[in-house]
Amino acid sequence: RRTFEWKRANPFGSLKYLSEFPLINTLVLSMIFVSIANHSMESVWAYFTIEKFKWNTSLIGYSLAVIGLLSIVVQLWLVSILAKKLGDRRMAIFGLMLMMTGFFLFAFTEWQWLLLGALLIYIIGGVQGTAIQSITSSIIPDNEQGELQGSLGSLMGLTTLIAPPLMTSCFSYFTGK
C-alpha cells in the first residue's frame, strides 16, 4: 500500500500518473471520449426527443426508466457472459462499435421504433466501459490499483463538468434553438 500524497490527489496529478503508463493512454483517451458522448444522453435526451419526435414528459420519463433498467441488466448479466465468450479486448471493441452505431442511429432516425432499437444497441454497448477498465487494471501493478481507479474516477468527474455545457451547446447550435 502506498502513502497518500496531496500532489497526486487531483485531476492533473491523475493525468501525470496515467501518462507514466503509455500502454493505457489510448484506453484512457477512449474512456474520456465515451464519457463525454454518454453525457449527451443525460444532457439532451429530453430536448432531442421533444424536438425530433414531439415526446411529452411521460414518454421521456418512461424512456429514461427503460434506459436505467436495461443498463442494470447489461452490467449485472451481459457483461459477465460477454467477458467469458469474447474476452476483455474483443468485448471493448464490440461495445464501442455498438455505441457508435447507437449514436449514429440516434442522429439519423426518423422513426420512433428505430430510436428504441438504437437505444437497445447503445445500452448493450455499455459493456465497453467494464472491458476497458479491466484492461487498464491488468496493466497497472497491484499496489497502484487504488491510484488508477482514483485517477480514472477523477477524469470521469471532469467529463461530467465539461460534457453537459458542451453537448447542450452542440444541440442548440445544430437545432437553432
Model-derived features: positions:
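Loop-to-transmembrane helix entry/capping segments in MFS-fold secondary transporters
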Residues: 57-58, 140-154
